[in-house]
From Swiss-Prot:
UDP-N-acetyl-alpha-D-muramoyl-L-alanyl-D-glutamate binds at S36, T159, T160, S186, R194. Its main location: cytoplasm. InterPro entries: Mur-like_cat_sf, Mur_ligase_C, Mur_ligase_C_dom_sf, Mur_ligase_cen, UDP-N-AcMur-Glu-dNH2Pim_ligase. Belongs to the MurCDEF family. MurE subfamily. NCBIfam families: murE (TIGR01085), PRK00139.2-4 (NF001130). This is UDP-N-acetylmuramyl-tripeptide synthetase. The modification N6-carboxylysine is found at K228. Catalyzes the addition of an amino acid to the nucleotide precursor UDP-N-acetylmuramoyl-L-alanyl-D-glutamate (UMAG) in the biosynthesis of bacterial cell-wall peptidoglycan. The gene is murE. It comes from the Bacteria.
Length: 516
């Protein structure tokens, strides 16, 4: 891989990003990096994010050939300085160019939504693995899968990687023979221009509800919605859950850049939806069976363009929850648009396991434990409502906390969800407190709970102890919900990632200890 200065500057000019160049020489970069620790001879270095000038000095010492920044730095004296008006946009464009535009060799399905992205991504990944004979890459909150060998599978750091990492991983996937990619796209990826210039074959919009609003994230819900909608603007075909909040706004955003024949809408049968203009629901689904182990639903095409995909049928999923049926429907339709058949979905959906998403742990005498990433009002409410419908006897205990430094709206949201669904017991605990006091966060959540409806609330800031307390207090017919962290193997505390065994491991180990 390499990038010559002449086409690089032309690309920046084309997108009106180039301000000026100092110390221009004729060079070809043989490496790109925003991390000074990874710089080697011939590297084009990007000064981004929480940049400190000493990083540029280090990059220069290690052999950086030039740097890209929004201003010149004395530490880069003597190096060609490519000065741009938006560092993140420039890095995305030049990263794609350096890696030879690998996105052009992939059929890309991109997924956004406040909740359900990871579940939908795994459903689609399994369907397409069947239809493409395992030529499918996956970029999710949990994993980055670039090929079929063990060394091609990694745990993810971000829902959507930094642009240089994203295009590097796409290049590796293409070189490994992958033909399709399923990727989650976060609102922050658009807010921070990590994916500027990237286009998708199919863009899925699952839902939107208040989340990620606060300092260090989105200043308003309108900004959050706008960033989510950018996925549709950049997709050749758009697939929208018509039951989402702000549906009319979302639909018109898609329609502004996409022909009506390339917009597909789906909804649960009987859903109360106001359709704008001449919009039609293309697919509807209805639940046939739901329990604590699986869901079964029927999918029906209603329009001619939908019928051409031949996806009508009955499907089972191994991930329980009626709300996950909508995620499965999105995956089925998107995979159909990528060439998969109904049979590909039928054969795979009932064998999908997603770590930390409705993960069930059985015990002999301490009830059933569910570990789920539910981390906002909408996801917690839907999870508790589903479990209550499935529970004929016994109590429900919820263990949760809220993150510090961001997502402030989650705290009243948790209080509201708990008040509405009225679990029998709640243990408020720690969940990535950052630079905030976890007890202060817990008491803020508690302040939004109606104590006439939720009477039994405890505070236990050691999350492992909180989980053990919940299990200790449960009997055979009870349910314990461990919400918010899923499979996260760390707690973010005072700027550090402190290792954490994961909710799943703590629960399993403790049950084994109690029942051996």
């Amino acid at each position: 891989m390499e990038l010559h200065i002449t086409p690089a500057l032309a690309l920046l000019r084309e997108h009106h990003l180039l301000d000026h160049v100092s110390n221009l020489t004729d060079f070809t970069a043989t490496s790109v990096s925003y991390d000074s620790r990874k710089v080697k001879s011939g590297t084009l270095f990007f000064c981004k994010g929480n940049f400190l000038p000493k990083y540029l000095a280090s990059a220069k010492e290690k052999g950086a050939i030039a740097y890209v920044a929004e201003k010149e730095y004395p530490e880069g004296e003597g190096l060609p300085a490519i000065i741009v008006n938006d560092e993140q946009k420039a890095m995305s464009l030049l990263g794609a160019a350096f890696y030879g535009y690998p996105q052009n060799d992939l059929f890309i399905i991109a997924i956004t939504g406040t909740k359900g992205k990871t579940t939908t991504a795994y459903f689609a990944d399994h369907i397409l693995a069947q239809s493409t004979a395992d030529h499918i890459a996956l970029f999710s909150t949990l994993d980055r899968i670039l090929g079929n060998k063990p060394e091609d599978k990694f745990k993810s750091d971000l829902t959507t990687p930094e642009s240089l990492d994203l295009f590097h991983d796409m290049r590796v996937a293409v070189d490994n023979g992958m033909t399709h990619l399923v990727m989650e796209v976060s609102s922050q990826a658009y807010k921070k221009n990590r994916i500027y210039g990237l286009k998708y074959d199919v863009g899925i919009f699952l839902n939107i509800s208040p989340d990620h609003i606060g300092r260090n994230e989105h200043p308003t819900f309108a900004d959050y919605l706008h960033c989510k909608e950018q996925l549709l603007v950049n997709s050749a075909k758009c697939l929208i859950n018509a039951e989402t909040e702000k549906f009319t706004d979302v639909y018109y955003t898609a329609k502004a850049t996409t022909q009506p024949e390339d917009i597909f809408l789906f909804a649960r049968r009987g859903a109360n939806i106001e359709l704008p203009d001449n919009a039609q629901i293309d697919f509807e689904y209805r639940n046939d069976l739901e329990d604590l182990h699986e869901s079964e639903f029927e999918l029906t095409a209603l329009t001619e363009k939908a019928k051409q995909l031949n996806l009508d049928g009955r499907y089972k999923t191994s991930v329980p929850g009626d709300y996950n049926e909508g995620n499965a429907v999105a995956a089925i339709i998107a995979s159909g648009l990528a060439g998969a058949s109904a049979n590909d979905a039928v054969e795979t959906l009932n064998h999908v396991h997603i770590r930390g998403r409705m993960e069930m742990i059985n015990s002999n005498t301490h009830g059933t434990i569910y570990v789920d990433y539910a981390h906002n009002y909408a996801s917690l409410k839907r999870l508790l409502a589903f479990l209550k419908r499935q529970t004929n006897a016994g109590k429900v205990t919820v263990v949760l906390g809220a993150t510090g430094d961001k997502g402030i709206s989650r705290r009243p949201g948790f209080g509201k969800a708990l008040t509405e669904e009225q679990p029998d017991e709640v243990i408020l605990t720690t969940d990535d407190p950052g630079f905030e006091d976890p007890m202060t966060i817990a008491r803020e959540i508690d302040s939004y709970i109606d104590h006439d409806k939720v009477k039994h609330i405890q505070f236990e800031m050691d999350r492992e102890t909180a989980i053990k307390k919940a299990i200790d207090g449960s009997e055979n017919d009870d349910i314990v919900v461990l919400a918010g962290k899923g499979e996260d193997p760390y707690q973010k505390v005072n700027g550090e990632d402190v290792p954490y065994p994961t909710d799943v491991k703590i629960a399993r180990d403790y049950i084994n200890e109690l029942e051996r």
